[in-house]
Amino acid sequence: AKRWVLLGTDYVYPRTTNKILNYFLKSKGVAKKDIMETYTPFGHSDYQTIVADIKKFAAGKPTAVVSTINGDSNVPFYKELGNQGLKAEDIPVVAFSVGEEELRGIDTKPLVGHLAAWNYFMSVKTPENKAFIKKWNAYVKKNKLPGGSKRVTNDPMEATYIGIKMWAQAVEQAGTTNIDAVRQAIGGQTVQSPSGFEITMDAKNHHLHKPVVIGEIQEDGQFEVVWKTDGPIRAQAWSPFIPESSKKVADWTYPWVCGNCTKAKF
């Protein structure tokens, strides 16, 4: 793509993500006039004007959309793309907040071919994921959850699974639930994830080393993995692309003991 549309819901995550993307794209030689940035309120459902603007913007050069639209609001956006005759081959969309749960029970035809970036997809074929899905299906059946057999697993579920297991391991190691003690014990903890990767909490910044997986939306509401990193990527707490944060340090070991510092505390 030569032009980029950064479209998101108006809150801190999309604005921070797009701030990083702006700096990144400009570092790759993308001109300011070739970046369109737009925000919508939570629950927004009328994308007619926005899609028309995107269509006009894309007329000059090949264009891609990075969507940080929150959850369910993605559906009317994709539908409007279809209404205006725009397919994934015309203007591909990569979303950071669309997963199996958002697609469950809706017509995915207008969404087929578009992309999503996560750390996990239900379609990942690993023994760990097979066991994870089996346990989830048994839980759904036992508790008679709405949707029954159509219930899905998704990235936030895997993230929760990893987080709880890591916390439990840290509590066992610390021998207490005291926050400070657990914080010291949790750095360096590892968990074998449903995605098949061994996930590690960084010993210093306490962010997770995780893989990046890009999936293409299918008609059945699942994703076909089209690209993934070879392994987990070391987490960076602060973006090197934003000048005001590039010198910040997140380090929970002595003498820093801080998540937002430019000099050590001790």
Regions found by a protein language model. Give the residues of each.
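Extracellular/periplasmic Venus flytrap/periplasmic-binding protein
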Residues: A1-Q84, S123-P127, A131
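Ligand-binding clamshell of periplasmic/extracellular solute-binding protein-like
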Residues: V66-V75, V94-L103, V124, T160-Y161
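Venus flytrap/periplasmic-binding-protein-like
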Residues: L86-L111, R183-Q192
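Rossmann-fold dehydrogenase core element
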Residues: T108-Y120
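C-terminal substrate-binding/catalytic core of Rossmann-like NAD(P)-dependent dehydrogenases/reductases
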Residues: K125-N143
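Segments of small-molecule ligand-sensing domains
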Residues: K141-M157, I164-E244, K263-F266
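A short, charged
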Residues: S245-F266
